[in-house]
Amino acid sequence: MKVSIFKTLYFQVLTAITIGVLLGHFYPEIGAQMKPLGDGFVKLIKMIIAPVIFCTVVTGIAGMESMKAVGRTGAIALLYFEIVSTLALLIGLVVVNVAQPGVGMNIDPATLDAKAVALYAEQASQQGIIPFLLDIIPGSVVGAFASGNILQVLLFAVLFGFALHRLGEKGQLIFNVIESFSRVIFGVINMIMRLAPLGAFGAMAFTIGKYGVGSLVQLGQLILCFYLTCILFVVLVLGTIAKFNGFNIFKFIRYIKEELLIVLGTSSSESVLPRMLDKMENAGCKKSVVGLVIPTGYSFNLDGTSIYLTMAAVFIAQATNTHMDIMHQVTLLVVLLLSSKGAAGVTGSGFIVLAATISAVGHLPLAGLALILGIDRFMSEARALTNLVGNGVATIVVAKWCKQLDNDQLQAVLSNKVLPNVKSSVSVS
């Protein structure tokens, strides 16, 4: 039976975003008051992320035949993340140098309001590779779940999955309980996702109402340049990777169109993390691969954020007439290879990492951040959308390289064929 287009989440979210834009533009004061709707939806999603990751990773690892496969999957995923995110940084650097969106603005850093970015600068001072690595280890298991820290929950889930696997048949009861709990959690997600149009409406109405279309026009060249670069990256880089791994990037984008629209409305790729776990498994990727690649990718494979970081940093230099020779840009690239891994798939994290990078490089005026503070929210959409597509592609590629991909299933879902929703039953090896 064909579902009416009016009942699809895709149509409802698209309609909600359109209404949000109109409300924010024509009635900005009312639009700015819609923020709680978007925040509330994102908080509901965050509430469920930790248990979803735990259940997915534990059942995925515990159900594998060999623990060597888990280590191999993790190593391949990290190698892929490093290569592709480095490509994203380089592409952003090349485009911003060619397009030069900041040249001619002639901004004096002394005239900028440094107070506007003081909070971000303070948060940036806490960034660093050692604190980042130590932060992956939770102070307590309960604390990891309470704070919703993705990497902390992932670490505990991996260890728990290994331990459960070693129990063999003795751990079967625990495995069954967690798998049943996982079904309940995904049932909760289905209920929450009914509110996605409301969340997208509130977030978009607030963005347009508070910042206005005028802020888009003022720095439109940078925004346009960034959006085009993200499209270029998705079509050429991710498209080429997809082609060499046997699937079409445009068919994949169509497959996750509902998730992309939710991200467009909320500006956070984290808002669809639970749905992506389910969708990638439905696309033929083994649960063990999905459970490792998707959550890890939310910190280590943020392609859109990587493009944004290089473009924004060089744009500030161009706008303030700060000279950046080749060595300065190489230094910037090296710093970003480390600092970009500290970003998360949440709104605003990219701006904090940018502040940390500028502080670390030392050559750029920190006050220059005030130039893009007003438009960062608009650039956040492109970052989040590119991040989401990038992590989806990464999951399929890693699954294929690890021989954990059902290619027939993948081609069927990408071709929009209806398949029986059969969950294969697995047991603790």
Swiss-Prot record:
Compartments in which it is found: Cell inner membrane
Main location: membrane
GO cellular component, one term: plasma membrane
A Pfam family matched in the record: SDF
TM region(s), chain numbering: 5-27, 47-64, 77-99, 141-163, 184-206, 216-238, 330-347, 351-373
Matching PANTHER family: AEROBIC C4-DICARBOXYLATE TRANSPORT PROTEIN (PTHR42865:SF1), PROTON/GLUTAMATE-ASPARTATE SYMPORTER (PTHR42865)
Family classification: Belongs to the dicarboxylate/amino acid:cation symporter (DAACS) (TC 2.A.23) family.
Listed NCBIfam families: PRK01663.1, PRK13027.1
Job of this protein: Responsible for the transport of dicarboxylates such as succinate, fumarate, and malate from the periplasm across the membrane.
Protein name per the record: C4-dicarboxylate transport protein
Organism: Yersinia pestis
